[in-house]
Amino acid sequence: MNTKITNIIEDLKSLTLLEAAELIKQIEETFDVDASITSQSQAIVMPTAVDNSNKNEIEEKTEFDIILEEVPAAKKIAILKVVRSITGLGLKEAKALVESAPKMIKDNTNKENSEEIKQQLEEAGAKVSIK
């Protein structure tokens, strides 16, 4: 056996359990691998990059931003009332927000709340998107 490998093996034998756990953690982070045991009889080291891409595709978005896209002039007052009730802004601030469309009305809302807000604004005549 190569002397370099022999030295590494001897160093590994002298590690405590805590040091061995830290070594495994560092190897996983450095080489982007997963050293967890996947079956009773064997340990398989697998790259985690593939797993991460699959997780990202499966994850469902939980926080949404509501964007006020367009405000027809004829519906401006009705939309202004809805925006004030949603945001809690004063008349002046809500008017500035409505007049500066496209503009974010609310951020980081859950799916149900964002759909409800979108429906209220669309009923008032606004064009709204959820991102």
Curated annotation (Swiss-Prot):
The keyword Ribonucleoprotein applies. One of its GO terms (biological process) is translation. Its main location: plastid. SUPFAM superfamilies: ClpS-like, Ribosomal protein L7/12, oligomerisation (N-terminal) domain. It is found in: Plastid, Chloroplast. GO terms for cellular component: chloroplast; cytosolic large ribosomal subunit. It comes from the Eukaryota. Gene3D superfamilies: 3.30.1390.10, Single helix bin (1.20.5.710). Residues 106-125 have a biased composition (Basic and acidic residues). Residues 106-131 are annotated as: Disordered. The keyword Chloroplast applies. GO terms for molecular function: mRNA binding; structural constituent of ribosome. Keywords: Chloroplast, Plastid, Ribonucleoprotein, Ribosomal protein. Belongs to the bacterial ribosomal protein bL12 family. Forms part of the ribosomal stalk which helps the ribosome interact with GTP-bound translation factors. Is thus essential for accurate translation. NCBIfam families: L12. Homodimer. Part of the ribosomal stalk of the 50S ribosomal subunit. Forms a multimeric L10(L12)X complex, where L10 forms an elongated spine to which 2 to 4 L12 dimers bind in a sequential fashion. Binds GTP-bound translation factors. This is Large ribosomal subunit protein bL12c. The lineage of its organism: Eukaryota, Rhodophyta, Florideophyceae, Rhodymeniophycidae, Gracilariales.
